[in-house]
Regions:
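Helix-termination/interfacial motifs at the ends of transmembrane alpha-helices
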Residues: 7-10, 14-29, 135-212
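Large intracellular
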Residues: 4, 8, 18-144, 216-265
Length: 265
């Protein structure tokens, strides 16, 4: 589990509750709970998001919320180490030996690439097939990101709509000045709900998925370059130096260690 994502959401919730209790007291917490405001804001935001995307992407977007808590199985340095290990196997035992090594791999993208080169597929065709799949994966990720970005935009918009509804009702009942304060407070709650939906949930989720997507795309590019280099019969050390160019300088030492471990296997 990615503890950082869970901690961020819970800390934000703590700050919110702390702020409310500090200003209004424990009993005043009820003042921030209004079912009608919640229905207008959340119902309107989710309904208009459904209008904006396909049903398939809507369902996939809702399900993707749990992905922010999933820790990556491998980082890019580990992936480079795995590819160097495979290159050593291919150099010692030949490309056909990679078919057996592929059975122990968990990543379907890497496994697919290995099976393509074991089958003797032309290198350009291997690249084309894998890059096409990479584009397809990135497209699905962008659809999910688009869902959360759309919902983030709809939340404050419907919060403002709810506030306007409350203000209209308040102005119609200005004959009783004692009701103006409470009516204004209720009207503003929808704006609060919309802002919370956008800035506490939707935008952080979207940003996390974008960050995870960038890491995954980099890893898949490393896989493509590494597998094509293995297919071309390049020296494992040359492959390692080539793939390390994907990493920032501070991470290249760990990649060296992974490569040395692979060479000793």
């Amino acid at each position: 589990m990615d503890i950082a994502s869970l901690a961020g959401i819970l800390l934000a919730l703590f700050m919110l509750v702390f702020g409310i209790i500090s200003s209004a007291g424990v009993g005043g917490f009820r003042e921030y709970l209004d079912p009608a405001s919640a229905i207008i804001t959340f119902g309107g935001a989710f309904s208009c998001t459904l209008t904006s995307v396909s049903l398939q992407n809507y369902i996939a977007g809702l399900k993707s919320f749990t992905l922010i808590f999933k820790a990556p199985t491998l980082n890019t340095s580990d992936m480079i180490g795995k590819i160097i290990e495979l290159s050593n196997v291919a150099r010692k035992e030949g490309l056909l030996s990679l078919e057996e090594a592929a059975t122990d791999l968990d990543d379907p993208f890497l496994k697919k690439g290995i099976l393509l080169i074991v089958d003797g597929t032309d290198p350009e065709l291997v690249r084309a097939i894998m890059e096409t799949e990479l584009v397809s994966v990135e497209g699905r990720h962008k659809d999910t990101i688009g869902f959360w970005d759309t919902l983030a935009a709809m939340g404050p918009a419907w919060g403002m709509i709810g506030t306007l509804i409350g203000l209209v009702d308040m102005l119609y009942h200005m004959d009783d000045p004692s009701t103006l304060g409470p009516a204004m407070a209720v009207a503003l709650i929808t704006t609060l709900y919309g802002s919370l939906l956008a800035n506490w949930i939707c935008t952080p989720v979207s940003n996390k998925i974008k960050a995870d997507n960038a890491i995954e795309m980099q890893q898949k590019e490393v896989m493509i370059e590494g597998l094509l280099s293995i297919q071309a019969g390049e020296n494992p050390r040359v492959i390692e130096e080539k793939l390390k160019s994907f990493l920032p300088p501070k991470d290249r030492t760990s990649a060296d260690e992974e490569g040395e471990a692979g060479g000793e296997a």
